[in-house]
Regions:
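C-terminal motif of bacterial Sec signal peptides marking the signal peptidase cleavage site
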Residues: 21-28
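Short helices/loops that flank or line small-molecule/ion binding pockets
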Residues: 77, 83-105, 110-118, 228-259
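Bacterial signal peptide processing site
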Residues: 30-32
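Short, well-ordered beta-strand elements
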Residues: 36-57, 81-86, 188-193
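Ligand-binding "clamshell"
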Residues: 42, 114-149, 254-266
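Short, polar/charged alpha-helical segment
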Residues: 46-47, 53-80, 207
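A conserved helix-loop-strand patch within extracytoplasmic ligand-binding domains
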Residues: 127-198
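Pocket-lining segment of extracytoplasmic ligand-binding domains
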Residues: 187-266
Length: 266
């Protein structure tokens, strides 16, 4: 179980001191793709940011098309088809919204800020909180499993996780001993990050590095970009990278897949 592994393996390296407001859940493009006053829509195109692998996202979102058609019908709109796709990157979704090749999208707050000249927020989301919310990394490494609570939250933290590789465990041991990591410690690790418009997967960790070391993710010697957090977790489990960055509830979200899907060790 991942619970056991949390006690000795996949430690939280650092908890970035940034809390981010939840993403602009549903964003509409600023360009009108139907005739004025028309309530007939042949295809309503929704693009999703790739925070998980495309297959998982599309399976989970399968009921969404029918729900949107029903809701729009109640508002007097006749929608022929709802097309749901997953973008190749966070920026790709923002670009599609800006260009009008997507009518609406589920994006991060960071992506919205980048493309807000052409997009408007339609809905924002809340999510379930988790039972840990500390700025002290050792509190996340106390051997107890992160779990979702019944409370809703309007923010979440960005964290940096160390994996089972030799370097990852070296960094985790230093943090758990109460020692401050140096820039050389961090620069000697291989990092997996998300695209540059991802809030928890790039922007906030980069700001944390700047505030603490005067450096950014772009200054790290060994960085690979993942197409989803699922890919980052898989790379971490396989020891292909030493460190990943992402949202604070990553371990709770991916616990069931750590060994069965990602090949992580107990």
């Amino acid at each position: 179980k991942l619970t056991k592994y949390l006690k000795k393996g996949m430690a939280v390296l650092l908890t970035a001191t940034f809390c981010m407001g939840l993403s602009a859940g549903l964003t509409g493009c600023g360009k009108d793709t139907t005739k004025e006053d028309s309530k007939d829509i042949d295809t309503f195109r929704i693009m999703i940011a790739p925070y998980q692998d495309a297959d998982t996202l599309l399976t989970g979102l399968e009921p969404l098309g029918g729900m949107i058609k029903d809701e729009l019908a109640a508002q007097g709109y006749n929608v022929g088809n709802v097309e749901i796709t997953v973008g190749t990157s966070y920026s790709a979704v923002g670009e599609a919204l800006s260009a009008g090749t997507a009518d609406a999208g589920f994006i991060s707050g960071g992506t919205y800020v980048t493309y807000d000249d052409d997009c408007d927020v339609l809905l924002t989301a809340q999510r379930k909180a988790i039972n840990k919310d500390s700025l002290n990394a050792k509190d996340w490494n106390d051997g107890t499993e992160e779990a979702f609570t019944d409370n809703l939250t309007t923010y979440y933290r960005s964290i940096i996780l160390a994996g089972p590789s030799t370097k990852g465990q070296e960094l985790a041991a230093k943090v758990n001993a109460g020692q401050k990591l140096t820039w050389d410690d961090l620069n000697g690790a291989t990092w997996a990050v998300m695209g540059a418009s991802s809030a928890s997967g790039y922007i906030y960790p980069s700001l944390w590095l700047y505030n603490n070391y005067g450096k950014q993710i772009s200054d790290l010697a060994n960085v690979v970009q993942s197409d989803s957090y699922t890919t980052s977790m898989s790379r971490l489990a396989a020891g292909q990278v030493d460190v990943i960055v992402g949202f604070a509830h990553m371990r709770a979200k991916y616990a069931a897949n750590w060994m069965s899907k990602f090949g992580g060790t107990d």
